[in-house]
Amino acid sequence: LGTVQFGLDYGVTNHDGQVAIGEVKNILDYAKDKGIDTLDTAPSYGNSEKVLGGVGVNDFQIITKTTSLQVGVANVLQAFHQSLTDLNITSVDGLLIHNIEEVKDKQFDSLYKELNKLKQDKLINKIGFSTYTPDQVDFLLDNFDFDLIQVPFNVFDTRLIDGGQLQALKNKNIEVHARSVFLQGLLLDFKHLGDYFSKWTKEFDSYQETVQDSELSLLEYALNFALNTSELDKILVGVDNANQLLDIVNSSTIGVNLNEFSIDDVSLLNPVYWR
């Protein structure tokens, strides 16, 4: 369960703003009841960590993220300890490097050593990275030992399957969390998009026809596309209220035939055949 909405207004289809504390409690109670055992947060998500600490998160595994390395290693470590304080816990299941570009910073090696010390001291169970592109995943696989990775993945974005990165991560026993399975809500609502998205109208229409033919809702299709991808260990979803989480949980038990998005034609899939 993502928690950015608990600390900030977030998402292209979020019309309600930041989630009220009482609703946060309802969401977490329902999540716990349904076996959702992991919360994803970050110091940069407004006051999300403080909200979670106030409500109580001892029944959940927590994934949080680093602050900017620009302020120095000591400050990043101090911010992590502040996260523990704000969350009202003594350790986290995972700490992700939030800005992947910082691996190129000359201070990064020093930070990574310090994080591994925190892991030895059992303040962190898994160290990992939040990524955005296949190239970043390739770079990490080539250069670092790590336990956990967060990647973008959805029915429109299967680059990590097509490029073999998901399989490579699994071969190294790295835990994979997928975010953006609803593409910030876009995959759930095509009716209220701004002009910026008009260039993809044809693709959106075609996708909606496919979903309609499957007799599933947009939510069911997008969610189960990710859930049926075996290389993914966890799917990260964010909600604004408990009813949305109820819808997601109720939509998560449907088997979906995923062949509808694969086009089995090598002359299309391999550019070497293009003329």
Give each language-model segment a name.
Residues 33-36, 89-92, 124, 146, ...:
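A structural motif
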Residues 52-61, 81-90, 140-144, 168-171:
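Acidic (Asp/Glu)-rich catalytic clusters
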Residues 59-72, 94-98:
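A short, structured active-site edge motif that brings together acidic residues
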Residues 9-22, 65-74, 104:
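Active-site mouth loops of central-metabolism enzymes
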Residues 100-268, 274:
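Beta/alpha (TIM)-barrel catalytic core signal, keyed to glycine-rich beta->alpha loops juxtaposed to Asp/Glu
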Residues 1-60:
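N-terminal binding-site loop/beta-alpha segment at the start of enzyme catalytic domains
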Residues 85-103:
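Active-site groove signature of glycoside hydrolases
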Residues 16-30, 72-87, 133-139, 222:
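Short, acidic/polar
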